[in-house]
Amino acid sequence: VFEMMGFTKVAVHRSKKVSLYRQGEINLILNEEPKSHAAYFAAEHGPSACGMAFRVRDAQKAYERALELGAQPVDIPTGPMELRLPAIKGIGGAPLYLIDRFGEGNSIYDIDFVYLDGVDRHPVGAGLKEIDHLTHNVYRGRMAYWAQFYEHLFNFREIRYFDIKGEYTGLTSKAMTAPDGKIRIPLNEESAKGSGQIEEFLMQFNGEGIQHVAFLTDDLIA
């Protein structure tokens, strides 16, 4: 699926069955490691986004501040010569990693992964440039909780609020954004009217989680 969307497998993990797919500024990690957090997450939720990462100025300071403000730590086992990345419990129990190593030659990928010979490390692919936003679907009455989670821990702010009503179903949505505007997370919950697409996702996914990831491109039609 990734390759059909223009992504290229550019690297593999040094010690685990994990692959790095890249296009533009987008990095997608495919984790096929057995008995890993990803494997247990998939067993509970099916194929899904089992984690995400925020770039921060100082990962350790951001992690310690998050814990002081009530975030729950997540301990991910690491192997030899592998970076230990600080992470907190995010939506649906998925780890939210805090990363301060990025840039050519100094990123987590340069340390934990081995680039494939003869493969362009920075493929243009189909023209997808970066992640535009990723959406969380949450239980009715929990949208305010997750909005406060991002506001409290990362100084996000609400930029839009939607109350979409249909004849039989509806949903409400808060669009949250990071202080620099580079991370955008719409939070969706079902309206009190009945069962619709949000409720359907929660049932199929077996809980709250990342419902979709949207990519930015200069030419959507192409």
Label each region the model flagged.
Residues 1-14, 22-75, 82, 87-161, ...:
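Glyoxalase I/VOC metalloenzyme domain signal
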